[in-house]
Amino acid sequence: MYAYSGINLTHNAWSPIVLELKTIAENLSSSKLNSVLINRYRNGLDSVSWHADDEKELGDDPVIVSFSFGVPRKFQIKPKDKSDKRRYLFSLDHGSVMIMHGNFQAHWLHQVPKEPKIETERINLTFRYITSVS
């Protein structure tokens, strides 16, 4: 069982399209991936707050490959070190792929902030490798 945002998730079979995206993600990242989280952002009020994908089940220096489909959304990153005031903003456009790897999760937080003016949806698939199940 893998827990995400306080929710225990169970295993489901890979659909053909998700399996195809997994293969693309593995080729782009040169990594083996065995799990995907699929999130639906119904509109700009759906968001994910500042966090790092640093759960122990992901191991050291996890590789996260993220596909975005639908309306573009903002993606922000900032250092975990509160004394470091750097901030970066990216656009997750339809069809884009973002890869976080190396020690990114150890040193950075990221979020998809609320954007109240957005009225259409976005689907996000994040592939990763789960090293152990608690």
What is each residue range found by the language model?
Residues 1-134:
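Non-heme Fe(II) oxygenase metal-center motifs and adjacent flexible, charged/small-residue loops
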